[in-house]
Amino acid sequence: MEDQIRQLKDIFDRFDMDADGSLTILELAALLRSLGLKPSGDQIHVLLASMDSNGNGFVEFDELVGTILPDLNEEVLINSEQLLEIFKSFDRDGNGFISAAELAGAMAKMGQPLTYKELTEMIKEADTNGDGVISFGEFASIMAKSAVDYFGLKINS
């Protein structure tokens, strides 16, 4: 936890251009862009408002920690375990990969049957090394990308 706080402080200080101990909306936008995110102006305003617990229009370091670290501390560990469980539920034969047939079966079981076109598009998008199956790493990447898209932020390609 201390390492995470130290890393977060380094990042915060790097983007606190005037070294006043707080991030302006422009400094927050620069920090987000450095992480590969492309939030719109409205999204940055909403994010700043949600982080700005003292209502002064800036994000202080403790507000950043209060927003980010609870998630890093508990949620990330829980989510990686949950992600592995989801992956295993798709990987019916337990070989460490999700085949097209396993993906189709799992989606149908969840009440979301796929057309052949949808299935091939999903495999193509997730299968970054082109071996025809989805590894856990590829599965985790596509799930992370989906989460980023869900929150309305875009990753630089």
UniProtKB/Swiss-Prot annotation:
Per UniProt, residues of the EF-hand domain are 3-38, 39-74, 78-113, 114-149
- Pfam families, sorted: EF-hand_7
Q: Determine the domain of life of the protein's source.
A: Eukaryota
Q: Any idea which positions bind Ca(2+) 2?
A: D52, N54, N56, E63
Q: Where does Ca(2+) 4 bind?
A: D127, N129, D131, E138
Specify which residues bind Ca(2+) 3 according to the UniProt entry for this protein. D91, D93, N95, E102
**Keyword Protein transport in annotation:** no
> What name does UniProt use for this protein?
Probable calcium-binding protein CML15
Gene Ontology MF terms in the entry: calcium ion binding
Write out the entry's keywords from A to Z.
Calcium, Metal-binding, Repeat
